[in-house]
Amino acid sequence: MELTPREKDKLLIFTAGLLAERRKARGLKLNYPEAVAFITCAILEGARDGRSVAELMSYGATLLSREDVMDGIAEMIPEIQVEATFPDGTKLVTVHNPIV
């Protein structure tokens, strides 16, 4: 199977997001890379589902709370930017204060 670097990046994000989802489901607090992957993966999937940029910006800020992440992680992530593919092209989705 031949994959472009972008496709490899998306698979890596998906794998990390899936791992974070499983750890969260088991009640574990997420660390920095897990929290970023969890939110990023959800945004990429939302774009694939046809949701708008505005919807995903709001949605991204509802996925995790401070109780879901290790101490200090929320302060380490003031925003997350994701380049997602929408039906009408690639767009940048910025989620401000993603962990409240």
From Swiss-Prot:
Heterotrimer of UreA (gamma), UreB (beta) and UreC (alpha) subunits. Three heterotrimers associate to form the active enzyme. Pfam families: Urease_gamma. Signal peptide: none annotated. Pathway: Nitrogen metabolism; urea degradation; CO(2) and NH(3) from urea (urease route): step 1/1. Gene3D superfamilies: Urease, gamma-like subunit. The lineage of its organism: Bacteria, Pseudomonadati, Pseudomonadota, Betaproteobacteria, Rhodocyclales. Keywords: Cytoplasm, Hydrolase. This is Urease subunit gamma.
